[in-house]
């Protein structure tokens, strides 16, 4: 038995990521807010290009494609976690294919991206509370 203590992480919540085939997520954002009763969370980019929407403790993300058509791959899900370093170490021990090391993002999260077998990205982020202007 290994007596070495291994740090562990804790999953807090998850969000589906809908890829919007448009230069803006505005119509979809308005649909979720005005017709389905979601509240606007984060909004990034002009148009906007990305939003989070919340209702009853559940979150959905809307993201624009970077080209006119659907991207072949992109975010499929986002998990908020505690202790991103421990999760990164666990994924490396398990042989997960990671897109990059832990990365500090301007929207106040530290993230790692695991690559699914079909090429989609499963993103894990820890909120740091430090958001760039």
Segments (PLM) and residue ranges:
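Short beta-turn/strand-loop junction motif enriched in small, turn-promoting residues
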Residues: 37-38, 65-67
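Vicinal oxygen chelate
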Residues: 1-11, 13-24, 41, 51-54, 67-133
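N-terminal beta-strand motif that seeds the catalytic metal site of vicinal oxygen chelate
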Residues: 1-29, 57, 75-77, 126-133
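Active-site/binding-pocket entry motifs
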Residues: 59, 66-68, 130
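Short, charged/polar, Gly/Pro-enriched secondary-structure boundary elements
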Residues: 57-61, 119-122
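A short beta-turn/loop motif at secondary-structure boundaries
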Residues: 44-45, 68-69, 105-106
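Core segments of cupin and vicinal oxygen chelate
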Residues: 19-59
């Amino acid at each position: 038995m290994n007596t070495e203590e291994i740090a562990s992480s804790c999953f807090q919540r998850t969000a589906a990521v809908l890829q919007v085939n448009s230069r803006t997520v505005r119509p979809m954002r308005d649909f979720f807010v005005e017709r389905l009763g979601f509240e606007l969370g984060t909004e990034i980019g002009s148009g906007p290009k990305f939003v989070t929407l919340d209702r009853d403790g559940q979150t959905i993300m809307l993201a624009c494609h970077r080209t006119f058509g659907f991207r072949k791959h992109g975010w499929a899900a986002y998990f908020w976690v505690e202790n991103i370093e421990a999760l990164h170490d666990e994924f490396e021990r398990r042989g997960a294919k990671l897109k990059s090391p832990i990365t500090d993002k301007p929207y106040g999260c530290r993230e790692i991206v695991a690559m699914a077998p079909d090429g989609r990205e499963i993103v894990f982020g820890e909120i740091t509370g430090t958001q760039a202007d």
